[in-house]
């Protein structure tokens, strides 16, 4: 799929059909590999020149917003597809591939009545896209919250012994619990194990001799048990910390372990459900935003053509997709098809300043022109 298109508008002197034929002929002759399509814009409500000029101040900003939301949803789709391991699907608008929707654009009269003022159409587009963006933020935040909880659990299960969950490393038989005795779990730096074995019995009184047993070792630490009298447990923790050993809090509970397993399974299920629903929502919403964007491009082309070529509306709007190597050639063809007087006028410094911030790259050409990137 081509990812870069030009939307251009050429001034019509005789008839749009004759200009269209000349454009096709010139493209076929000098740049045959450049696809060219009519961009069918209906007769929109012009309003006053003042209203057009006021609208022009907002066109570029509104375009950036709508395009930005479109790209944001596309990036979210790509991330979700990558995480899910699903094959990327071609994005569509009402079942039509996005490039085909652009090149065969048809104005949606039911959604955007052509008799509505242009400002009202633009505000309507921006309002609809803003609602979708707000919905996206809420849905992504909900998904990321579940994902964050799972990541935190995974870090605890796969992190170092200083932070990870110990429940799956400690068996019931490793723990001695009675009225007077308690078993503590000490996290010992990997290269300090000899020091631990040499001193743990003397860190405080009433430590059971030879009670320390290694349960697990990772790249940084080793996990040891030690059994002692309950009444000296706090003193042992303090003495161990002073020696560089960490005594982890731990409570052996089969019920608690089962509860954690159930919570983890539910989080995994919730994440998969949210990911699937978010991906489907993104597919649908991308189509809605892309459709809104193309209608906005039609309004923008119409408004800028009136401001460039005057009233009544007399212009030919089309979509081209030249290869990079053919761009200069196609620009030259488009320029030759413009009226020479208009070419000089719209290339003047006065025009460049007046149209700056309005027509994107159009101030450098004697015709309306801006680029649409689909990737």
UniProtKB/Swiss-Prot annotation:
Modification(s) after translation: Phosphorylated on Ser/Thr residues by WNK8.
Subcellular location: Vacuole membrane
Provenance organism: Arabidopsis thaliana (Mouse-ear cress)
Disulfide bonds: none
Gene: VHA-C
Matches recorded under CDD domains: V-ATPase_C (cd14785)
Membrane topology: Peripheral membrane protein
Family: Belongs to the V-ATPase C subunit family.
Protein known as: V-type proton ATPase subunit C
Physiological role: Subunit of the peripheral V1 complex of vacuolar ATPase. Subunit C is necessary for the assembly of the catalytic sector of the enzyme and is likely to have a specific function in its catalytic activity. V-ATPase is responsible for acidifying a variety of intracellular compartments in eukaryotic cells.
Origin organism lineage: Eukaryota, Viridiplantae, Streptophyta, Embryophyta, Tracheophyta
Subunit structure: V-ATPase is a heteromultimeric enzyme composed of a peripheral catalytic V1 complex (components A to H) attached to an integral membrane V0 proton pore complex (components: a, c, c'', d and e).
Biological process terms in GO annotation: unidimensional cell growth
Keywords linked to the UniProt accession: Hydrogen ion transport, Ion transport, Membrane, Phosphoprotein, Transport, Vacuole
């Amino acid at each position: 799929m081509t990812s870069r298109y030009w939307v251009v508008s050429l001034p019509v002197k005789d008839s749009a059909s004759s200009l269209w034929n000349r454009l096709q002929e010139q493209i076929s002759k000098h740049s045959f590999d450049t696809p060219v399509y009519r961009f069918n814009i209906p007769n929109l409500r012009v309003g006053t020149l003042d209203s057009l000029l006021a609208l022009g101040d907002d066109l570029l900003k509104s375009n950036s917003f709508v395009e930005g939301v479109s790209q944001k949803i596309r990036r979210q789709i790509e991330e979700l597809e990558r995480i899910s391991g699903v094959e990327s699907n071609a994005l569509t608008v009402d079942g039509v591939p996005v490039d085909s929707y652009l090149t065969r654009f048809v104005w949606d009269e039911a959604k955007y009545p052509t008799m509505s003022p242009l400002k009202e159409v633009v505000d309507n587009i921006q309002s609809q896209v803003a609602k979708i963006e707000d919905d996206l933020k809420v849905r992504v935040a909900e998904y990321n919250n579940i994902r964050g909880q799972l990541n935190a659990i995974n870090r605890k299960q796969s992190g170092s012994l200083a932070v990870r969950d110990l429940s799956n490393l400690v068996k019931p038989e490793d723990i001695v619990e009675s009225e007077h005795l308690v078993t503590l779990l000490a996290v010992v730096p990997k290269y300090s194990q000899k020091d631990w074995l040499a001193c743990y019995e003397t860190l405080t009184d009433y430590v059971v001799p030879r009670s320390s047993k290694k349960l697990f070792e990772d790249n940084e630490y080793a996990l040891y048990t030690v059994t002692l009298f309950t009444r000296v447990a706090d003193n042992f923790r303090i003495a161990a910390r002073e020696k560089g050993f960490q005594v982890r809090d731990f409570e052996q509970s089969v019920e608690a372990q089962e509860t954690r397993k159930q919570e983890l399974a539910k989080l995994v299920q919730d994440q998969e459900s949210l990911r699937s629903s978010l991906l489907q929502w993104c597919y649908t919403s991308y189509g809605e935003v892309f459709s809104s964007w193309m209608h906005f491009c039609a309004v923008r082309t119409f408004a800028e053509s009136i401001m460039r070529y005057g009233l009544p509306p007399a212009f030919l709007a089309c979509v081209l997709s030249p290869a990079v190597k053919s761009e200069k050639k196609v620009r030259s063809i488009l320029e030759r098809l413009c009226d020479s007087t208009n070419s000089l006028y719209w290339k003047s410094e006065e025009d460049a300043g007046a149209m700056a911030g309005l027509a994107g790259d159009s101030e450098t050409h004697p015709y309306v022109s801006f680029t649409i990137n689909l990737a």
